Amino acid sequence: MQEGNSFTELLKNIIAETFKELSKPVDKLQYLTVTQISQCPRRSWYELKKGGLDLASEYADMGMVFHSLLEDAVKNRQELGKCYTEVDIAKPFYGIEIRGRIDTLCISRDAYRIIEFKTTNMQDGFKGIETAHLRQVSLYWYLTGSQPMRKEIYLVYIDRKTGEVKVINMRHESILKKRELGNRIKYLVRSFNENKVPKPEPGRSCIFCPYKTVCKAWKRSRY
């Protein structure tokens, strides 16, 4: 293989600079992502203040593969409506721009359906909707605003080993209140601006957190 030509070097430099830019700490908070709001606030604080990308995570890679397979499986099925995958969304919410990416959006004549895919382990049975996932779909509910047709949200859990699938049609009353999400956003913004490390939320995700060696909260987790 040839590695020394000018195109190779150009491509290498462009990609390296892109990831370097994405890994930089944030000096001034201009927006938050749905993931940053949904996950442990301490993890989000470290991501913003310390920078860095968790690209080497085997768990993350596995999730990306599952997402790609599932999105490909639904987007060309006409009986589901017109389906779009990896749908970017950005909207002001409680004084700051919130950015997200919906896994799949299926639109038919009578329904506007938001679908989020999650990988899990159901070896000992389904453990219920994770709080971070509930926050995520609740944010998408509000960020997509009112629609002329019926709006629905689905959480799809897939067992990483067996392929077992559990589909949850989120009832409107299960969606978190705007105020609860707004308070969470304001807390994260305030923690960033005051340079104060927020309280952690120990849970299953601590196992895969790239900041667990500095946080130590995972030691208090029961998972």
UniProtKB/Swiss-Prot annotation:
PANTHER family associated with the record: CRISPR-ASSOCIATED EXONUCLEASE CAS4 (PTHR36531:SF2)
Matches recorded under Pfam families: PDDEXK_1 (PF12705)
Xref: InterPro entries: Cas4_exonuclease, PDDEXK-like_dom_sf, PDDEXK_AddAB-type
Protein name per the record: Uncharacterized protein ORF223
Coiled coil: none
